[in-house]
Amino acid sequence: YEIPKRDWSSDVCSSDLSGPDGRPEHDIPPLVLEMAMEIEDAPRHLGIHSGGMVICDRPVIEVCPVEWGRMRDRSVLQWDKDDCAAAGLVKFDLLGLGMLSALHGAVDLVREHKGVEIDLATLPQDDDVYAMLCRADTVGVFQIESRAQMATLPRLKPRRFYDLVVEVALIRPGPIQGGSVHPYIRRRNGQEPITYLHPLLENSLGKTLGIPLFQEQLMQMAIDVAGFTPSEADQLRQAMGSKRSRKRMERLRLRLYEGMAERGITGDIADQLFDKMAAFANYGFPESHSVSFAYLVYASSWLKLHEPAAFYAGLLNAQPMGFWSPHSLAQDARRHGVVVRTPDLAASGAGATLEVCPESHGGFAVRLGIGSVRGLGSDVAEHIELERQRHGDYRDIEDLVRRIPEITLPQLEAMATGGLFGECFGMERREALWAAGAAARSRVDRLPGLESATVAPTLPGMEPIEVAVADLWATGVAPTGHPTQFLRERLDEMGVVTAERLATIDATKVWVAGVVTHRQRPATAQGTTFMNLEDETGLINIVVSVGCWKRFRPVARGAAALLVRGRLERVEGVVNIVAEHMTPLTVAPGVSSRNFR
């Protein structure tokens, strides 16, 4: 029997459905259907959890089968996570969070430069930190720095730690798609009564105002309304959240209905409860995770408020991570009064560090690291710093080349463009570029001074906008200025409103301008695109409808900076511009956006 080649995968899932005439609504040959049923629920392939670990009280080979992984000296358990848990193995999923590195680095910098020891585990609860969060001043803060989170914070108004636990769990695809966000906020602000589908749900849903958010609540709901044991409730959570647990789910469903009937819950109420629990199981976030994440939210917020220079330096050293680019982080630092300085061969370490600066907020400036220069890499940057610590400062560019033989001409040119030879050698950037080309020919196998004696001609210094362009190209950060500030006079003549004036200006239609930092089109937004613009005074939220995107698609999708005319909206402390017209804005090159779905 020859089976025609085609894809029946979607039909197999509904193979038991019949049409009006009683015949199956598919054309799957019986042999294919029979074979599909035989392999149903079998593992499709073997996979390894990238951060999964188990702990056992004896050699694990005595408990479950083990095989060697492809990585040297790495062993892999042949059971899946559910079987490991059922056998009593303690299972951990290790998350790689860049914010942990950023916090570690910030605490180390505070200890090194101020002699103060910060224990993140014992940070005091601070009303000023929560006030900062209510203003959505959260660029760089863990988990709540996205556009959606920043738009929610002024409405949620977090004033205690558990509010952050809810915030972390609330702004996720599941609660958004499940319609939980707006009801929770309305109930929190007293705009909607707190209700429960059944009085027995108050015990499990009371702390989240009747809105289910956490997986633990699903388990407590089963215990309260159906008399499940904790073990049965956990099985229900696993079965509801798995696409491969239909048989187990059907068994637990009968148990759930029996338990509800014993407590007088029958008919439509029982069906609604089951449907609500089944829908919620697909997106419920573990409360334990949310609490852990919320503490990182608070710790990063506390550091941003009380140790801003160390906070920004820690973030810059942990890149790439988070929602915002290094340039946006540096601009946010400037808006908070923190001085950010370009890297310097004599003053910088491999990574960003702190320098005493009375003019900077908190008394310290951020000095960018040598490793921030494009194409240099951490290994070369660390070698440059280590060589300087061991044998003293570099005398000139030729001395650098002779002591760091692996450095290349493109790397020297990037360092010159980024201003690394300015403060230490007193060289203008164009002069440094000239000298770098000559010095690159000096190596340890040649006599000193033979190649680099060429005297650079008198070259003009760079204009401020040229310095900003050079910084953006060399390091991705322009500490001395934002691209829009060099256009501000022309933008003012056009009536363009700055970001800081949008909260108070008396107008319904405005022009705004800025560099595009983000473009987002979430699956939950029905085609609406959200953009962030940044000018020298702050951030601007742009909402682009489907129709507007179609009209201005090439500009909206490809321009590095935009002029936007739109309707000004101010709702519960959140300011948005609903775009009606877009045109490209020519600014300093080198600024790129981060685009997400």
What are these regions (language model features)?
Residues 10-597:
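Noncatalytic, beta-rich nucleic-acid-contacting surfaces in large DNA/RNA-processing enzymes
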Residues 1-12:
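Single conserved hydrophobic/aromatic residue that forms the stacking wall/gate
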